A protein has these predicted regions:
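A glycine-biased, small/acidic residue-tolerant capping/turn segment at secondary-structure junctions
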Residues: 85-97, 139-145
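Catalytic-loop motifs flanking and including active-site residues across diverse enzymes
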Residues: 40, 44, 71, 121-127, ...
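Short, well-ordered amphipathic alpha-helical segments that serve as non-catalytic structural scaffolds
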Residues: 40-55, 130-136
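Active-site-proximal alpha-helical scaffold in enzymes
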Residues: 1-7, 119-139
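Short acidic capping loops at alpha-helix termini that bridge into adjacent secondary structure
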Residues: 58-63, 87
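Short glycine/threonine-rich loop-to-helix capping motif typified by GTGT followed
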Residues: 31-36, 69-92, 119, 158-165
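Condensing-enzyme catalytic core mediating Claisen C-C bond formation in acyl metabolism
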Residues: 1-46, 50, 98-110, 114-116, ...
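A short beta-alpha structural unit
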Residues: 22-25, 63-72, 113
Length: 170
């Protein structure tokens, strides 16, 4: 993976992948507070909205996503905050197969953090590498057919979230 401007990228490869949008937001959490709502991550929602706006896409345009699933509930919360489904519907979204091949969006085709490991400091790079492979049609048996727009979500602790939108087109 090489980061380069659009013009240079087109001279390096005939299958460039472009970063089309980014968003970052931070919320403070008091883990000792009984008043915090840990099932909603407003910073993730703000980061996603910013990335979608910059990329000129919405949640329904995403073909494949790598989300930060450091524990099972984190993935479900991410589905809702990223706009893949409505609040309170993540369980039904997964049960209906909407986050799998043939569904609305294929999430974590390489197994996510739970399936592949969570190397602190390198997780985001691993996610980007999977997105890169997907958008270049180089993901082998994990390949999402026709993937053209992708998303990665990473977070630090519970309060800082980064969302990136990638595409085959600039």
């Amino acid at each position: 993976m090489i980061l380069a401007g659009e013009e240079r990228a087109r001279t390096i490869t005939d299958k460039p992948v472009f970063i089309r949008g980014t968003g970052q937001a931070l919320d403070g959490f008091q883990l000792t507070s009984l008043h915090e709502d840990y099932a909603h991550w407003p910073a993730l929602k703000r980061a996603a909205e910013s990335a979608y706006r910059m990329a000129g896409v919405g949640a329904s345009d995403i073909d494949v996503a790598e989300v930060h699933d450091c524990f099972s509930i984190a993935e479900l919360i991410a589905y809702e905050e990223l706009g893949f489904c409505k609040k309170g519907e993540a369980g039904a979204f997964v049960a209906a197969g909407r986050s799998d091949y043939g569904g609305d969006v294929v999430v974590n085709p390489r197994g996510g953090l739970i399936g592949c490991g969570h190397p602190l400091g390198a997780t985001g790079v691993a996610q980007a590498a999977e997105i890169f492979a997907q958008l270049r049609d180089e993901a082998g048996p994990r390949q999402v057919p026709g993937a053209a727009v992708a998303l990665s979500h990473n977070n630090s602790g519970m309060g800082e979230h980064v969302v990136m939108i990638y595409g085959r087109d600039a």
